[in-house]
Amino acid sequence: MVTVERVARPRPDNAIERRIWDVAATVVDPEVPVLTIEDLGVLRSVRLADDGIVVQITPTYSGCPAVDAIRDDIVTALSAAGHRPARVEVVLAPAWTTDWMSESGRDKLERYGIAPPAPRRADGVIRLGLGVRCPNCGSLHTREASHFGSTSCKALYVCQRCQEPFDYFKEH
């Protein structure tokens, strides 16, 4: 039986790796600049290797155009903080899931005007399609205007109450 990890990874126990994690965790997603890669759950691991630091990330989807920018920003942030040479590895399995997004990240999305994905229930119960909550007025009376929003990981919705369009971060 294969199990897929559906939770965010904890910060490292090792003090040096934890400091490196803390620096890498400050890198923001260039497509959703209100979120860090830690908020998104994209930052997967940090470890020390003989040739430097290895940071692993899992993009929100395999063709994410932000991967190169995130990789460069991690290396730049670590270098600016005085850490030895770093390389970033992109890990595609297990695939990223919105379950890895932190509660803080979900709150930041909503305050930014993007409806966050609903958290998956641990007991396996499937959430009924009750509507996506409008981040502007809180109404559940919304409709999908386009399955594709400003980025591939978002859909465009319109609130029927306040008439405002908004992005919805798709569940994965």
Question: What would you call each of these model-derived segments?
Answer:
Residues M1-H172:
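Domain-level signature for proteins that mediate thiol-based redox and metal-cofactor handling
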